[in-house]
Amino acid sequence: MWLETETFQIDKNENLEVNIKIGEKLQGSNRPYIPNDVEEFYWSQNGKKFNVNSRLGDSPAFSENINDNGLTSIVYISKPSFLTYDTMEKFEKFANHKDLGPVKKLHASLGFPEKNFIETYRRFAKVIVGVGSSSGRDTNFGLLIEFILLNNPY
């Protein structure tokens, strides 16, 4: 899952639209805004944080008129999702696809069952857009997994 916009620079007072994307290798489809899936969805600019005011089914999931200059971050954190694996083989196939290493051995060493076990996962996404002068710096929002730009690309 990732956040995607058509353009990464806009003029101030212009509308910014951002889609939630589901897929792999940056190929995927748009997902509408579903509040029951969202723990946090906000945007931040110039040290201020604003909640996203989307409604069920909105696509794009984010559409906001940005009135100030500055580097702008849109952040999405999902609620936990659960996936049941009937067999270890199914889990190993997933782990190999994601290149996670020798998970079967780790799984066993932690005393987890070989059948009918549950994976809990969350999704974290952030997109950076330059608005107007695009001044400012990226911020560490404390996501469990997060890239932080060391330099402003705009």
Where are these regions (language model features)?
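N-terminal soluble domains immediately following signal/targeting peptides that reside
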Residues: M1-Y154
